[in-house]
């Protein structure tokens, strides 16, 4: 009881959420550093731009429209007309400022090539992509039908991203995350019971299982030899 410790209040806070992709059950959630200090739950309330983490949903839409992992796409400079993005003239770049020329769709995702993601979106159409991402639970209001959608310029919450990626993880079914399994009184009688959407039972199949499988395999390569190789330090083989 005589021990002392120093606690430093963070200037920047993060969030964490874990969801069972087969029924939407929220296994764990951390909304911030200290709930007593700040009631703002970053998992459910923090709307942020997802950036490149949104690209797999655009790639998935591309697969649905006829692209394959071996499709050749040009990673080359591009000038976008203002009307296509709802703003000013746009000359998108890759993160490193370099261009790789013709490459496969698989290679482009592994290296997170912005120009390839944009060209995929141009080929399938922004209206179609906006409709398609709704299959993962994303709303059209937060993701305007502009080419900037290819780079994750919309708005999502961490819980929304977990919900979206669950579709890939469970083989193509959409499940709605839930917090409470059931409510019981002091005698153990169930007053309320959640009826979750369960994969293989009542969950809606929103994308082709083959699409989900291919996307998962492509995302695994991002860890094996792409922009997320640091994740290999965890020593796991199931990460994507």
Model-inferred region functions:
Residues 1-48, 52-56, 70-71, 127-134, ...:
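Periplasmic/cell-envelope proteins involved in peptidoglycan metabolism and beta-lactam response
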Residues 1-18, 29, 36-40, 107, ...:
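A penicillin-recognizing enzyme superfamily signal
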Residues 17-18, 27-29, 71-74, 107, ...:
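Structural recognition of the beta-strand scaffold that forms the well-ordered cores
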Residues 23-25, 33-37, 49, 78-81, ...:
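Solvent-exposed loop/turn segments at secondary-structure junctions
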Residues 23-24, 44-75, 108, 164-168, ...:
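Active-site SXXK
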Residues 87-94, 125-163:
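Mid-domain, small-residue-enriched loop/turn segments at the edges of structured enzyme/sensor domains
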Residues 121-124, 131-136, 143-146, 176-181, ...:
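Short coil/turn segments at secondary-structure boundaries
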């Amino acid at each position: 009881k005589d021990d002392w410790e120093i606690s430093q209040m963070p200037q920047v806070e993060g969030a964490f959420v874990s969801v069972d992709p087969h029924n939407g059950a929220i296994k764990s959630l951390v909304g911030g550093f200290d709930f007593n200090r700040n009631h703002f739950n970053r998992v459910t309330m923090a709307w942020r731009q997802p950036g490149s983490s949104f690209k797999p949903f655009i790639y998935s839409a591309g697969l649905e429209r006829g692209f394959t992992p071996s499709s050749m796409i040009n990673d080359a400079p591009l000038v976008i007309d203002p009307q296509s993005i709802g703003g000013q003239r746009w000359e998108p770049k890759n993160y490193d400022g370099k261009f790789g020329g013709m490459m496969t769709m698989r290679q482009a995702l592994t290296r997170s090539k912005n120009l390839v993601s944009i060209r995929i979106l141009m080929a399938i159409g922004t209206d179609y992509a906006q409709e398609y991402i709704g299959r993962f639970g994303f709303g059209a209001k937060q993701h305007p039908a502009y080419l900037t959608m290819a780079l994750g310029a919309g708005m999502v919450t961490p819980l929304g991203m977990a919900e979206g990626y669950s579709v890939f993880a469970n083989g193509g079914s959409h499940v709605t995350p839930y917090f409470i399994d059931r409510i019981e009184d002091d005698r153990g009688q169930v007053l309320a019971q959640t009826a979750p959407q369960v994969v293989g039972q009542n969950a809606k199949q929103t994308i082709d299982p083959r699409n989900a499988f291919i996307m998962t395999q492509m995302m695994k390569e991002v860890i094996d030899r792409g922009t997320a190789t640091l994740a290999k330090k965890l020593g796991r083989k199931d990460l994507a």
